[in-house]
Amino acid sequence: MYRIEADRFILEFFPEIHEQDFAYPVNVYLGVKVSSYGYSADTFMDVGVQGIAEFALQLKNLYETLSGEARLEEPYSVHNYLEFVAETGGHIRVMGRLNNKSAFGYTQEINFENEIDQTYLRDFVNLLLADFGRYAE
């Protein structure tokens, strides 16, 4: 599990890697939980190991330079996404759209935005890179 927990914001990743699908762009079932100011979602994203690796590298650059952005988005389906954008003063804006893809016959969707201090990224980024860095192109 990969987790960021700050005041009024929690983001968790639960990846299931499907090595037999490495020839395809989507090979990770990424469980995602988010809670932002009391609004929450528990869903999944269909992404690839290379997409997560690139996202982790973007996050590392954002953390180290306090500039730029990092985005993880599904290549297909409803295009769920998570985005981190550097702001002034060492703050990081975290936003995204998560849709449950009509699980259980009903559509649920959350659009969220929050802000965290850069220090909350360090462990999250290091864990992602340790596990997914080898998949970077």
Model-derived segments and spans:
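Charged, alpha-helix-forming regions
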Residues: 1-21, 28-36, 41, 45, ...
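Charged, amphipathic alpha-helical segments
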Residues: 5-17, 59-67, 76-79
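Short acidic/polar mixed-charge low-complexity motifs
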Residues: 9, 37-41, 78, 90, ...
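DNA polymerase processivity clamps
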Residues: 21, 64-88, 136
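Intrinsic, low-complexity N-terminal interaction/targeting segments
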Residues: 22-29, 79-104
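Short, well-structured hydrophobic secondary-structure segments
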Residues: 31-67
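Beta-strand elements of well-folded, non-transmembrane domains
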Residues: 34-38, 49, 98-102, 116-118
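Mixed-charge, glycine-accented linear interaction segment located at domain edges/termini
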Residues: 101-137
